[in-house]
């Protein structure tokens, strides 16, 4: 959503700064530049929002997209504390400020005990039918609608917004279409580090009637409930390749039990072997989806970005 908003604003000729939880961009480096720009578009995680809470400030326009359990190791399983940090994005709003809320997160906000002073906007679920948007999945279309509401608030015409959205392409690691090899589509969804994110990815590129997804999954333990994802995998997947790691160990037995449902299941050590296995078993017309659902930390990668870079390199070198 952050990149969508930034793309719309830039396309409309606005001078902006993009920062926050963005790869290769240090928020500290941007502080001197912000005064020279008219707008700052920041993606803020719960840790960054802790700082907003310490300073008792919230952005004048806030977009709260979704809320799912994450970072439960750090929060010691306290989902209320996690939401409390996230809530700093709107907690210190004034009457003139704006909170744009995704439909999924609305019940959590309604249960929140604090008073919200700003105006709340809940976008429509779909873009106008005549608009062409290239990213797969209903969640991406809804993300686009969140960005549309920001543009409208800033008096950017729908005509300019439409033109910007129709030129937007997928971001690295976020349901990024890499290539088609021998009739097999390959998607890099490396940024999906939670079970909920992987479920959304399966729904975006999969089909419950066809079951043509070859899923690559696994990583380090994030202390999240994997039960819903385990229930969803058989609906979309013909094959699953497990990437051996500490988190993967927790779901191995249940994933291997899918063999009783006619789903082929394998486990490999190292990303290169895992990807090669997926390509060796995938058939023409199927889709290989790399959506880990776990942390990147462990012995194989420096960080999440390194994991994604390695996957892209391996896929590009395949013949």
Where are these regions (language model features)?
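Short beta-strand-centered segment that lines the nucleotide-binding/catalytic pocket of NTP-utilizing
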Residues: 14-25
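Flexible active-site lid/hinge loop adjacent to a nucleotide/diphosphate
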Residues: 34-115, 124-134, 298-305
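Short glycine/serine- and small hydrophobic-enriched flexible loop segments
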Residues: 29-32, 148-153, 203
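A short helix->loop->beta-strand "cap" motif at the edges of active sites that frequently abuts
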Residues: 93-98, 115-119, 237-238, 260-263
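A conserved segment at the C-terminal end of the G1
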Residues: 1-15
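A conserved, hydrophobic alpha-helical segment in the catalytic core
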Residues: 55-69, 101, 106-109, 135-170, ...
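Residue-level signal for inorganic ion chemistry
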Residues: 21, 43, 65, 82, ...
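ATP-dependent carboxylate-amine ligase
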Residues: 152-157, 163, 167-171, 177-319
């Amino acid at each position: 959503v952050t990149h969508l908003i930034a793309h719309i604003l830039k396309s409309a000729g606005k001078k902006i700064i993009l920062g926050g939880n963005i790869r290769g961009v240090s928020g500290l480096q941007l502080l001197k530049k912000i005064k020279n720009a008219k707008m700052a578009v920041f993606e803020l995680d719960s840790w960054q929002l802790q700082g907003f809470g310490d300073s008792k400030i919230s952005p004048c326009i806030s977009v709260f997209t979704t809320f799912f359990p994450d970072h439960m190791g750090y929060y010691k399983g306290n989902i209320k504390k996690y939401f409390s940090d996230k809530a700093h994005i709107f907690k210190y709003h004034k009457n003139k400020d704006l909170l744009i809320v995704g439909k999924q997160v609305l019940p959590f906000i309604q249960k929140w005990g604090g008073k919200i002073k700003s105006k709340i906007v809940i976008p429509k679920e779909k873009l106008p039918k005549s608009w062409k948007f290239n990213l797969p999945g209903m969640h991406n279309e809804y993300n686009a609608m969140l960005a549309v509401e920001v543009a409208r608030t800033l008096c950017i015409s729908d005509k300019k917004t439409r033109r910007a959205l129709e030129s937007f392409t997928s971001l690295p690691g976020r349901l990024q279409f890499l290539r088609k090899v021998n009739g097999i589509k390959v998607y890099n969804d490396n940024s999906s580090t939670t079970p909920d994110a992987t479920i959304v990815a399966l729904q975006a590129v999969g089909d419950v009637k066809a079951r043509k997804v070859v899923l690559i999954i696994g990583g380090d333990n994030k202390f999240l409930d994997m039960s819903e994802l385990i229930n969803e995998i058989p609906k979309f997947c013909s094959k699953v390749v497990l990437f051996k790691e500490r988190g993967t160990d927790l779901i191995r037995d249940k994933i291997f039990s899918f063999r009783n449902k006619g789903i082929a299941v394998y486990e490999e050590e190292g990303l290169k072997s895992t990807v090669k296995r997926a390509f060796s078993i995938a058939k023409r017309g199927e889709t290989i989806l790399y959506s880990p659902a776990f942390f990147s930390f462990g012995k194989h990668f420096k960080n999440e970005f390194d994991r994604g870079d390695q996957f892209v390199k391996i896929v590009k070198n395949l013949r």
